[in-house]
Amino acid sequence: AEGPAWSSQGRYLLWSDIPNNRQMRWSEDDGHVSVFRMPSNYSNGNSFDFQGRQLSCEHLTRRVTRYENDGTATVLADSYNGKRLNSPNDIVAHPDGSYWFTDPPYGGQLYEGEPDAAGGPSNSAGKLNPRIGQPAGFVPAKRELPTNCYRIDPSGRVDLVVSEDQVPDPNGICFSPDYKKLYVVSTGKGPGDTGAGGKGDVFVFDVGADNKLSNGKRFSDFTIDGVKCGPDGIRCDVNGNVWCSSNAGRAVGYNGVTCWSPEGKLLGRIRLPEVCGNITFGGPKRNRLFMAASQSLYAVYTATQGAGPA
């Protein structure tokens, strides 16, 4: 499970089932689970903007899509400076109407969407056949861009806001409650990837009035008890605390969710019996933390509320 997002208008949770190329929905009213969208173009991260429209990061098509309230779909971004995106991973909305998203290489993995063409960073030996299991007419392509973060302006212009040199392999992304800080997770390489690769850190930037970022620094190296806990999805609560999912692999007891103060102090942990990929706050009062793990969804009521669109 990946990319959980809460619809306050529909009072449901949706998430991505990447390997099965579909999105799922859980209804709060009756607890019913159903297929929400299939195919999903191997979507990963999802969220909702301030108008209640779903935003989705698609691996297969290497694009960011917005689903309008009338049911139509709008492609927000699929390239930068004439080059195709890698595999948009996570996305958040800003009150000014812009969208900010990460573009790491993970969709180039065999199990997550579109493997690189022969010679690409995720298929350097050229032994993987990217066409197997894909739609008719599918044309594989090599990675064309570094792993960056972008901002989609309300006009439709796509701007680079965080480069690979600053945050390699960016993954989770979120704003502080006042939108004056941007948090970006830098994760490690995927299996067989020969790209830059992050080191499992979380970075924070100041956001200026002109949407320019400054004062970028490491927020946390995400090491607890000497164990590198592998951050992935990230969200802030209304108090500015930072909640982050944890993929510690075989380090039993370190998978789940961690909560950090705005100063980077560890406040607490939620331990799960499996790897946690992403999180979101939801429920009618937005005080319930939903956790998308490798094979399950978990939820816990908290004493705070998630920041972001109501």
Predicted feature residues:
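Short loop/turn segments immediately following beta-strands, especially the blade-tip
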Residues: 204-212, 301-309
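Beta-rich, blade/repeat-based domains predominating
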Residues: 1-11, 39-58, 63, 81-101, ...
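Short, ordered coil/turn segments that flank beta-strands lining enzyme active or ligand-binding pockets
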Residues: 8-9, 19, 28-29, 50, ...
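Blade-edge beta-strand/turn elements of extracellular beta-propeller
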Residues: 30-39, 67-84, 148-169, 206-226, ...
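A short loop-to-beta-strand structural motif that recurs across blades of beta-propeller domains
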Residues: 22-24, 63-65, 147-150, 201-203, ...
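Beta-propeller domains
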Residues: 8-38, 141
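Short, solvent-exposed loop/turn segments at conserved positions within beta-propeller repeat blades
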Residues: 18-19, 59-60, 108-146, 191-200, ...
